[in-house]
């Protein structure tokens, strides 16, 4: 007997992907393999196995990618100071390339003819996933249910779930939940009342940060050590990449650090509103910029700042594996070996304040910058410098 074709579905165990699982089974004569990338999201392994097995799935894979995600994706992005449209630290964007890469690995392992994802037809993630799929498995078919099925709204999904006895989760108010994406780097919340920009975000949707009103009335100090541009220790203790970020998430979250409410311009051309929490990532971004300010020369820093918007846009748009992103990463990392030292941050009710910078490889000269008299800086050269630049105004 000829074996069935196989489809590998990026599966979370939640409502959307459980519906997609059932839909694939109904519409394709194929075995569906459920694949979950553990990148530090709030994962319920029992729920994933329970919900998939209810629908007759035999192969359920949960792959631990937390350290790979932080070390090979988050850290390079932090080194590039990637911020989209001034505030977004790209927490969802940076996760998709790794998931797509590993999903294709599983597809090849099982000799699957297709992969599938749960991204909506209006979102950026469909692009991010499918660019990753193409890079690693250009001959593998992509099935994107949201672009082809007849279920066009959340209401349609809920009705389909009821019809097929698929568990429908509830939020804290007992209603169908917001659209939430999370990983060890961030949590995003979208949909429902947030779709109207005039509505403020209710406090109960925040999962990893307290409000400034509930944060301690006393500031906290956190020390982050860097080696070759990457964090290696928090408050003097070394951690693995995922544990280090988890530690910073806890410290920042309890001090109300890392909340962003953003109306962003999606790659596909529409605007969307999302509420993001990136507590540990916010600390890393502040600390990394601070340590670079005393270890890198002016030209290197300015070149990095010049390319940053494009670098961030490439990540946002799903071009992590593009030649252009690789090229910009080489520029970003050109002098990372000099970025060593420690930064202390003071945290208070959502604020992040640089407390101190300490390094043995400093590009900062106290003698040259001092207001006291010194012989290391020739002031007569300044007049010639100014006269030269006056010519540019003629």
Task: Give the ranges of each region predicted by the language model.
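Nucleotide-activated chemistry modules centered on ATP-dependent adenylation/adenylyltransferase
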Residues: 1-10, 15-394
């Amino acid at each position: 007997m000829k074996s069935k074709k196989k489809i590998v579905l990026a599966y979370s165990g939640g409502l959307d992907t459980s519906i997609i699982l059932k839909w694939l089974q109904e519409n394709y004569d194929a075995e569906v393999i459920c694949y979950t990338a553990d990148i530090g999201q709030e994962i319920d392994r029992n729920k994933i196995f329970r919900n998939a097995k209810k629908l007759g799935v035999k192969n359920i894979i949960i792959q631990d990618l937390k350290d790979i995600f932080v070390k090979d994706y988050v850290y390079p992005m932090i080194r590039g100071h990637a911020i989209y449209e001034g505030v977004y630290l790209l927490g969802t964007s940076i996760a998709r390339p790794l998931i797509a890469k590993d999903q294709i690995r599983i597809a090849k392992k099982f000799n699957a003819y297709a992969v599938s994802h749960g991204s909506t037809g209006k979102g950026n993630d469909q692009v991010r996933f499918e660019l990753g799929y193409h890079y690693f498995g250009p001959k593998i078919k992509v099935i994107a249910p949201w672009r082809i099925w007849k279920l066009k709204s959340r209401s349609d999904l809920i009705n389909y779930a009821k019809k097929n006895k698929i568990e429908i989760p509830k939020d804290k108010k007992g209603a169908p939940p917001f659209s939430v994406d999370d990983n060890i780097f961030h949590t995003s919340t979208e949909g429902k009342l947030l779709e109207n920009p005039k509505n403020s975000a209710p406090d109960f949707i925040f999962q990893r940060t307290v409000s400034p009103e509930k944060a301690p009335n006393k500031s906290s100090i956190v020390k982050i050590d860097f080696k070759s541009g990457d964090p290696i220790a928090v408050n003097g203790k070394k951690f693995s990449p995922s544990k280090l970020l988890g530690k910073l998430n806890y410290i920042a979250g309890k001090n109300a650090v890392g909340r962003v409410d953003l109306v962003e311009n999606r790659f596909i051309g529409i605007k969307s509103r999302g509420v993001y929490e990136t507590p540990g990532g916010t600390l890393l971004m502040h600390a990394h910029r601070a340590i670079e300010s005393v270890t890198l020369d002016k030209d290197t820093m300015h070149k990095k700042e010049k390319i940053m918007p494009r670098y961030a846009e490439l990540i946002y748009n799903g071009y992590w594996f593009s030649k252009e992103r690789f090229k910009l990463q080489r520029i970003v990392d050109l002098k990372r070996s000099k970025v060593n030292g420690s930064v202390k941050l003071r945290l208070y009710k959502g604020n992040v304040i640089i407390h101190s910078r300490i390094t043995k490889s400093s590009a900062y000269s106290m003698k040259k910058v001092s207001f006291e008299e010194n012989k290391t800086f020739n002031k007569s050269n300044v007049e010639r410098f100014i006269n030269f630049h006056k010519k540019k105004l003629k």
